[in-house]
A protein has these predicted regions:
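Class I (Rossmann-like) S-adenosyl-L-methionine-dependent methyltransferase catalytic domain
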Residues: 1-221, 242-246, 260-335
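Structured loop/turn residues at beta-strand edges in well-structured enzyme cores
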Residues: 160, 225, 253-254
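Conserved acidic residues
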Residues: 163, 228, 257
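A conserved beta-strand element that flanks and buttresses the S-adenosyl-L-methionine
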Residues: 231
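Short catalytic micro-motifs in class I SAM-dependent methyltransferases
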Residues: 234-238
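A short glycine-rich, Lys/Arg-flanked "PGG" loop and its adjoining helix->strand segment in the class I
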Residues: 245-257
Length: 335
């Protein structure tokens, strides 16, 4: 490995190893980052489901995205002091076909989602429970897990497809937890890797029978085309531009069919905006330049701006991260 790659690897490892195992265990799985309601995590699961089943579950995936939008709106409400009566007024307004709960404007995507469901439904449950009258009240686990239960039941009778899937920078099984909980993991041949030994210790502790290894995305220990699919979240912005290109090259090398890549900080400009932060980076990546890197490896990249997707499909204008993009990347077949 080149000296620059070694140095950046060491810096990245130190950046994560300074955190406690408990901090790493809960990092990126709470609040808007909870993979049950985080749109990019949901899009990743939908990517895998589509690879296995085509468009068979298209209607269910649409409902799951709507559920995420409604639940995230509720989470924002709960960050303010809220009384049970206020939630009940929202439900009353929805039942009456209204869009106003005594001065509280109900977003159109919330009203439209309610209209697609037969009552009683999960939205009745979301707005009927009684939060503690303090700020930042959590939504009960059983409500957050609504689609976890649905997917687990829907997929229960499916035979394992054994498509091989790699997740570099898997953290403490951050997304894998929900592949397992949603009944998707058993259909896949999954392998997770992370540079941080504490993350891998956490992941193995939670899932001793799953395959997790300490590994470097800059030097993946696998043959060319070893995996059918790959998914990766929140990695590339933390790399120098030179190392970013190496990481993408390695992922493309070992992936035979398709990749789903989640980015948290991208823009439509022509150049990457490089921002070193401590021992690593917090860059704003150019969509066009990043697509071009994938295309060097005979990959076709479809870039989805999450905010635009949610605006156009659901009329949702209040997503928490306007800079989030998801790339769906497929290997081009020789002509």
């Amino acid at each position: 490995m080149q000296e620059q790659l070694k140095l950046e690897t060491e810096c990245l490892a130190r950046s994560w190893m300074r955190h406690s195992r408990n901090t790493l265990r809960t990092y990126l799985v709470q609040d808007v980052q909870d993979p049950r309601i985080n749109v990019q995590s949901i899009l990743t699961r939908h990517f895998l489901i589509e690879q296995l089943f085509g468009v068979r579950f298209e209607t269910l995936t649409e409902h799951e995205l709507r559920f995420a939008l409604v639940t995230n709106w509720l989470l924002r409400l709960l960050k303010k002091p809220v009384r049970p009566r206020q939630l009940h007024l929202i439900l009353d307004a929805l039942l009456a076909g209204g869009d106003d709960a005594e001065g509280l404007k109900i977003p159109s995507y919330v009203s439209e989602t309610f209209a697609t469901l037969a009552a009683p439904n999960y939205m009745c449950d979301l707005f009927c429970w009684s939060p503690v009258e303090t700020s930042d009240a959590p939504v009960p686990e059983h409500l957050l897990s609504t689609f976890e239960v649905i997917w687990r039941e829907v997929l229960a009778c499916e035979e394992p497809r054994r498509a091989s899937v790699l997740e570099p920078a898997c953290g403490s099984a951050n997304d894998y937890r929900f592949l397992e909980a949603f009944g998707l993991a058993r259909l896949l041949d999954y392998a997770g890797s992370d540079l941080c030994e504490k993350n891998i210790a956490n992941a193995r502790g939670i899932f001793p029978d799953a395959r997790f290894n300490v590994g470097n995305v800059l030097e993946i220990d696998a043959a060319d085309g070893a995996y059918d699919y790959c998914f990766v979240h929140d990695l590339f912005e933390h790399l120098s531009v030179e190392v970013l290109e190496v990481a993408i090259g390695e992922i493309c090398r070992v992936t035979q069919k398709g990749i789903c890549a989640g980015f948290f900080n991208m823009h439509d400009g022509d150049a990457h905006v490089v921002r070193p932060v401590g021992a690593y980076h917090w860059n704003s990546l150019s969509v066009a330049k990043t697509k071009a890197i994938f295309e060097q490896y005979n990959m076709a990249a479809s870039a989805v701006h999450v905010d635009t997707l949610l605006r156009s499909r659901f009329g949702c204008t209040d997503t928490h991260n306007k800079r989030a993009w998801t790339f769906v990347i497929t290997r081009q077949q020789p002509t």
